[in-house]
Amino acid sequence: MKISQAVGNACTVPASSVETHNNNPSKESKIIYLPGTNCEIKSQALLSAFTSYRVGGAAELYVAPRNIEALQASLRYAQEHNLRVTTLGAGSNLLVSDRGISGLVIATRHLRYTHFDHQTGQVTIAAGESIPSLAWEIAKLGWQGFEWAVGIPGTVGGAVVMNAGAHNSCIADILVSAQVLSPDGTVETLTPEELGYAYRTSLLQGSNRVVTQATFQLQPGFDPAYVTATTKQHKQMRLTTQPYNFPSCGSVFRNPKPYSAGWLIEQSGLKGYQIGGAQVAHLHANFIVNRGGAKANDIFCLIRHIQQEVQERWSILLEPEVKMLGEFQAA
């Protein structure tokens, strides 16, 4: 079994937010109940509702556990049936193929809890918690160290896996440990050193382990008004420099030191360049936005076009930061 990271009642598949999509008319949508839990797995669940690009096909199987026991049961099911597993957080750094994803998609968005230790200044957060919401909550307590993360549109699990960062700060700077779950149900607690952090990556990417929670070291005891004001400054900076009026995945490419990917793309004359409904943003060239009606393959083809143009002009091959899942068709 291979796992891709991307990231109360045991688990739920909300009828209001999960649509079904049958890529193959011979396949029927069905619900699988996992023994010993209230957990149910749904087939042919459309993933566009769960990605920030608002594109993508269906998951062959989809489940959203609400606790560790349900997550373990889901992983056991995948292992027993030799299914590929993809972990889905907020879907904010993800491009899902129009053809969908085979195997089991496990959404961690319902793994939600936060514990503040006011003596040590440490906070333990479940994988499904929203990074921006946490940044505001932490600021209102007067704790410093998380202000920079307010503009990161993801969940804790995904942020830990990719070492998310902004404003010259990143997850590795504040992480104490991450709890991860192996396919056999084994729970491990890993330090930043054991995670092998580097720029926007960790050893968890492409591994067979799922982040369940993380503990961060912050600095309590500051004026909440001051920390909140600093957090607002970080948010405002992102609002004025990055496009939020159309769906996107955030930064598409990693910055190839010493250059900025956005600068290379802009200098290649690609701002505003469009394929189908996908466009290089005018405000920030390292963003590709869905102008409306875009297909995942439009975005994929635009990514490839940008890579070709930048490499031809600058002899630099831009490396995508966005994770692409499924099969795509080059133009």
Swiss-Prot record:
This protein's record includes keyword Transcription regulation: no
Localisation: Cytoplasm
E.C. number: 1.3.1.98
GO function terms (MF aspect): FAD binding; UDP-N-acetylmuramate dehydrogenase activity
Keyword Cell division appears in the UniProt entry: yes
Pathway(s) served: Cell wall biogenesis; peptidoglycan biosynthesis
Protein name: UDP-N-acetylenolpyruvoylglucosamine reductase
Organism: Nostoc sp. (strain PCC 7120 / SAG 25.82 / UTEX 2576)
UniProt gene name: murB
